[in-house]
UniProtKB/Swiss-Prot annotation:
Superkingdom, taxonomy of origin: Eukaryota
Protein function: Histones H1 are necessary for the condensation of nucleosome chains into higher-order structures.
Main location: nucleus
Name of the gene this protein is made from: hil-4
Composition-biased stretches (Basic residues): 201-210, 234-244
Key word DNA-binding present: yes
Protein known as: Histone H1.4
Family under the similarity heading: Belongs to the histone H1/H5 family.
One annotated GO molecular function: nucleosomal DNA binding
Database matches in InterPro entries: H1/H5, Histone_H1/H5_H15, WH-like_DNA-bd_sf, WH_DNA-bd_sf
Biased composition (Basic and acidic residues): 139-149, 188-200
Natural source organism: Caenorhabditis elegans
Length: 253
């Protein structure tokens, strides 16, 4: 016999699978499939964002933005919302939603019908909704504007307080310096003035005698006494007679 024949004889033929082995395999397969199903978590369906807000909001925005004395008509509202938002090409559905929104607004007293009946006519906003109705973009802008305003006001207030405190401190410091310098100067000047006053009191300056104006003696005119005729001139005294000379002595013999 050849080597190939011996090898063929030595290999054992596999045993035929029994029914029990088939059942165990099937049960294992089902359990594995259930485990895989349990492991796979269900992915939640993510709803796509709507391309436009609800029709009632769009209608209120259109009525508030369209400026018409009589109020905007349904055609004007439709034109506004179709130009601003992407509503698609199905005009019948758009008109149906618009009519429903108008009727709903009239029932809830959000809109006031200026003229016409039902969805056909002109509309105005009620007083309550007119003050509340704003576009979402405008509301966001208002919110951002308020935030910016508050931040800028807070920053300005903080800087203003810092500047005010620094300026007040500087002014107070300068005021104190000025006050001290002025007080010191005034005190020094006061001391000097007191010293000078004391010196002046010690040294008595001679009093100047005010010269009284000399009374000019007015010469009174001498009154000439008129010689009255009664007054006679006093008699002149007789001239003294010369004394008689003594007789000369006779010569001696």
């Amino acid at each position: 016999m050849s080597d190939v024949a011996v090898a063929a004889d030595t290999t054992e033929t596999p045993a035929a699978p029994t029914k029990a082995s088939k059942a165990t395999k099937a049960s294992k397969a089902t359990k594995a499939s259930k485990a895989t199903k349990a492991k796979t978590t269900k992915v939640p369906m993510v709803k796509a964002d709507a391309a436009h807000p609800p029709f009632i909001n769009m209608v209120t925005e259109a009525i508030s933005s369209i400026k018409d004395r009589k109020g905007p008509s349904r055609a004007a509202i439709l034109k506004y919302i179709t130009t601003k938002y992407t509503l698609g090409d199905q005009a019948n559905k758009i008109n149906a939603h618009l009519r429903k929104a108008l009727n709903k607004g009239l029932e809830s007293n959000a809109f006031v019908q200026a003229s016409g009946n039902g969805a056909n006519g002109r509309f105005r906003l009620a007083e309550k909704t007119a003050s509340v109705a704003k576009s979402p973009a405008a509301a966001k802008k208002d919110a951002t504007g308020e935030k910016k305003a508050t931040t800028t006001v807070a920053k300005k207030a903080a800087t203003g307080e810092k500047k005010a405190t620094t300026t007040v401190a500087k002014k107070a410091a300068t005021g104190e310096k000025k006050a001290t310098t002025t007080v010191a100067k005034k005190a020094a000047a006061g001391d000097k003035a007191k010293k000078t006053e004391v010196k002046v009191k010690k040294v008595k300056s001679p009093k100047k005698i005010a010269k009284s104006p000399v009374n000019k003696v007015t010469k009174s005119p001498v009154k000439k006494i008129a010689k009255s005729s009664s007054m006679k001139a006093a008699p002149k005294k007789a001239a003294a007679k010369p004394a008689k000379k003594a007789p000369a002595a006779a010569p001696e013999a």
